[in-house]
UniProtKB/Swiss-Prot annotation:
Full protein name: Prenylated Rab acceptor 1
Superkingdom of the source species: Eukaryota
Annotated localization: Golgi apparatus membrane; Peroxisome membrane
Keyword ATP-binding set for record: no
Pfam families: PRA1 (PF03208)
Organism name: Saccharomyces cerevisiae (strain ATCC 204508 / S288c) (Baker's yeast)
Residues annotated with Phosphoserine modification: 18
Modified residues (N-acetylmethionine): 1
Topology within the bilayer: Multi-pass membrane protein
PANTHER family named in the record: PRENYLATED RAB ACCEPTOR 1-RELATED, PRENYLATED RAB ACCEPTOR PROTEIN 1
InterPro entries, A to Z: Prenylated_rab_accept_PRA1
Amino acid sequence: MNQLGALAQVSRFTQNFSMENIKSEFQSLQSKLATLRTPQEFFNFKKISKPQNFGEVQSRVAYNLKYFSSNYGLIIGCLSIYTLLTNLLLLFVIVLVVAGIVGINKLKGEELVTPFGSFKTNQLYTGLVCVAVPIGFLASPISTLLWLIGASAVSVFGHASLMEKPIETVFDEETV
């Protein structure tokens, strides 16, 4: 029964890759990219300064995370791509698993007939797991993920804490 539950989860996962879902996600991505700030505004070196105290760091980070959220998402996306391109074994494992799941789902529950015999879908999934897990451990996904988290945090929080807020927001925060 546990295998049927796992198979149902995988089936629901692959249904998320339907053309309608892909189109709606693409439109959502386009609207998110429309809120990107210009490079001149994002890399404005005139607005970079050392914060006076930790309270100022907190207010800068809170403001800049909202204001530059699309830019920060793009930076994290670029760092993710860089991570996969520098760890080719991990990229291979990800492609292998996705291609294996898509290929098994194209069988639509039928057996795969080869000259070596016929294989049921649960046998194919088991074979995929038996191949992907050991190679996945060799690809060091945990250290790659930790590097990605660290590099993203340093990049995003470093920029957000050093970039000054616009002068208008300083006057809005003051109470008279």
